[in-house]
Regions:
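Soluble non-cytosolic domains of exported or imported proteins
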Residues: 31, 35, 43, 76, ...
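Solvent-exposed, polar/charged alpha-helical surfaces in well-ordered, non-transmembrane soluble domains
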Residues: 35-39, 80, 84, 126, ...
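Electrostatic cytochrome c docking/interface patches
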Residues: 20-44
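Short pre-active-site segment immediately N-terminal to redox-active cysteine/selenocysteine motifs
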Residues: 44-48, 56, 124
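Gly/Gly-Pro-rich "capping" loops immediately C-terminal to redox-active cysteine motifs
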Residues: 27-31, 50, 54-91, 97-111
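Bacterial N-terminal signal peptides
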Residues: 5-15
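C-terminal capping alpha-helices of c-type cytochrome domains
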Residues: 101-137
Length: 137
C-alpha cells in the first residue's frame, strides 16, 4: 500500500516542480471504466462528489454548489488535469476545500482508522477520470 502512495506523491511532485498542472500517467497503467466512474461520482457513500459539485445528473437531488459544475469537465480539462485534481487538488490550489482522494501523506484531521488509506483506490480514480472525460457538453 505504501508503494502506490509513494508513486502518487512522486508524480505530484514532479508535475508541480516542472510547472505542470496535470498527472499524465494512469495510476493503474490502464484506462478506467466510465460506467463505474459515474456510479462513484453520484454515490453518496463512495465518491461524495455531489456534496460540492453539480452536474448532468437530473435523477440526483440536492447537488452541491460550492465547486465547479461537472458538466463539460472533459472539455475544460485534460485527462491528466482531471487526474491531478482528484488525486491531490491541493497541488493546484493550496487553499482548496476539496479533499485529496488518493494522497495519504501530510493530511490534517484524519481519523485514526483512515490514516494511510486513500479515499478512492487507484482503479476508482481512473474510473472517475474516464467518466469525467465523457462529459463534453
Amino acid at each position: 500500500m505504501r508503494l502506490p502512495a509513494a508513486i502518487v506523491a512522486l508524480c505530484c511532485m514532479v508535475g508541480v516542480a516542472s510547472g505542470e498542472d496535470a498527472m499524465p500517467d494512469s495510476l493503474t497503467g490502464a484506462k478506467g471504466d466510465p460506467v463505474r466512474g459515474r456510479a462513484i461520482t453520484v454515490s453518496r457513500q463512495v465518491g461524495l462528489c455531489l456534496l460540492c459539485h453539480s452536474g448532468p445528473f437530473p435523477e440526483e437531488r440536492f447537488q452541491g454548489n460550492l465547486a465547479p459544475d461537472l458538466a463539460g469537465a472533459g472539455k475544460r480539462w485534460s485527462e491528466g488535469q482531471l487526474r491531478l485534481r482528484i488525486v491531490d487538488p491541493g497541488r493546484i490550489n493550496p487553499a482548496t476545500i476539496m479533499p485529496a482522494y488518493h494522497r495519504t501523506e501530510g493530511l490534517a484531521r484524519v481519523a485514526a482508522t483512515y490514516r494511510g488509506k486513500p479515499v478512492l483506490s487507484a482503479e476508482q480514480i481512473e474510473d472517475v477520470v474516464a467518466f469525467l472525460m465523457t462529459l463534453r457538453d
